[in-house]
């Protein structure tokens, strides 16, 4: 999903920076508020960031100028809500661009919007919509949809940048999305399953924290213990 350095036209790269910046600033404020409100959540916050970094660092070949990989942002969105993920995801993408040459600095704004803004919000919508139906299903959908939404947005960004020789945006979008789908749909399903296992584990080792964050009720944590 990470769009490579220099792959977007400068004007479009700047536009995505402009679109993403308010979300990142709001996210930074949300992180500060969260830490002040609940200092004990810092460890889980760091773990969510590490989880996102580890999963999104997995790099599989895909569309020219990009790559396929899990995102891990759905878990952080469930735990801390999307504004926090905008800031965490930005740090993850920045470090990956600098340390791993994964993504790029000029394309950071576009990558932030797809992976740290759009994906988490779509995943969180699934969590809110299905959490009262079945928590495991809600976690699965949140993780999988956060992943898939990221790649839909990335396909859109690439189609805008490269609409094809005839300028057909729709055809270009379909081309990018179909190539991503080959690897990304299986990855999204796998990420959803991993998310279910992760939260089953967290209810056992971090039950009080999940209750305090409002992710699970005390009764749900006790039932899972």
Which sequence ranges carry the predicted segments?
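Hydrophobic alpha-helical transmembrane segments
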Residues: 14, 42-47, 86-90, 113, ...
